[in-house]
Amino acid sequence: MEFNIHRDFSEDTGIRHSKYSETSGEDFYHECLNEVFYECYTKNEILRLELDGGDDGYTPSFLDESIGNLVYDFTLEVVKRLLVVVSTWEPYWIALIEKKTYPKWEDRRLTGKQARITRSHGPWYRLINGTPEKRVWITEVSDI
């Protein structure tokens, strides 16, 4: 499956949290990426996440929040197996994800340090003992 953030989510992306910007990494994860990745997981299909296409690129926090939450909810092993992040314009984004986001969020997952949400979201998928479960996993909205 192919998903281009600028084509399939928003031409303009924001920063990390919903409270501070529209089309944030938090929004992208909860409105799109979690569901699309779950679909790929159930079909054992690769998700090709295209970063190229927009005028302004991304803030590192947008990518960290959205892809980091994916690691937290599906494990680093599963994300590395099923997600291919593509950018011919800015290979730096891919290096940032692989070198910083992946290990940081896998550590958070292993230590149980939940992500923060800055607005309420509907239910989303998370792997529990290898089985996807859909529910609202975080109910406390953060002030940050």
What are these regions (language model features)?
Residues 5:
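Hydrophobic residues at beta-strand termini and immediately following loops
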Residues 8-99:
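Amphipathic alpha-helical interaction surfaces in cytosolic regulatory modules
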Residues 2:
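Active-site cores of enzymes that catalyze phosphoryl transfer or operate on phosphate-rich substrates
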Residues 95, 99-144:
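A cross-taxonomic marker for long C-terminal extensions/tails that follow the last structured domain
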